[in-house]
Amino acid sequence: LNSPNAVLQHMSIPQFLGKGTPVVFVRKSESDYGDVVRVMTGVYIKFFFKTSKLCVDETVWKVNDEELVVTGGNVGNENDIFKIKKTDLVIRGMKNVYKLLHCRSHLGCKNIGGNFKNGYPRLAAVDDDKDFIPFVFIKA
């Protein structure tokens, strides 16, 4: 049985805010204590499912060879690390707007932007520093 592994983007329409799938941030370093994830700290991102259904064993995000964000990563793999960076954007009065970076070991970081693949809005690692999808975090 093959499970779908695409990480898709909820469109930024007000009625959809907060209806995406919750994620958990797993800190890369055990020396980063507490419940707070600090900006520009290496983290692994994994979907948080409250279910026992099939296809939830691959929940950790990674970037594949096509530069698309997919599941199937591993906590502990240096190539599956993301970072959160604060931006100066203000969206709908919200000042705490962030962008995600994918940081492969020894290759630097790329913004997480978007593209359409097979008709779906996909998250993807992009080279252009000005091309990124802004994120607002909502506690699940």
Swiss-Prot record:
Entry protein name: Cysteine protease inhibitor 6
Q: Which residues form a coiled coil?
A: none
* Matching InterPro entries: Kunitz_inhibitor_STI-like_sf, Prot_inh_Kunz-lg
Q: Which cysteines are joined by disulfide bonds?
A: 103-109
What UniProt keywords are attached to this protein's entry? Disulfide bond, Protease inhibitor, Thiol protease inhibitor, Vacuole
Its GO CC terms?
vacuole
* Pfam families with a match to the protein in the record: Kunitz_legume (PF00197)
Q: Which GO MF terms does the UniProt record name?
A: cysteine-type endopeptidase inhibitor activity
Where can this protein be found?
Vacuole
Q: Which family would the database say this protein is a member of?
A: Belongs to the protease inhibitor I3 (leguminous Kunitz-type inhibitor) family.
Q: Which organism is it from?
A: Solanum tuberosum (Potato)
Q: Which domain of life is it from?
A: Eukaryota
Q: What does this protein do?
A: Inhibitor of cysteine proteases. May protect the plant by inhibiting proteases of invading organisms.
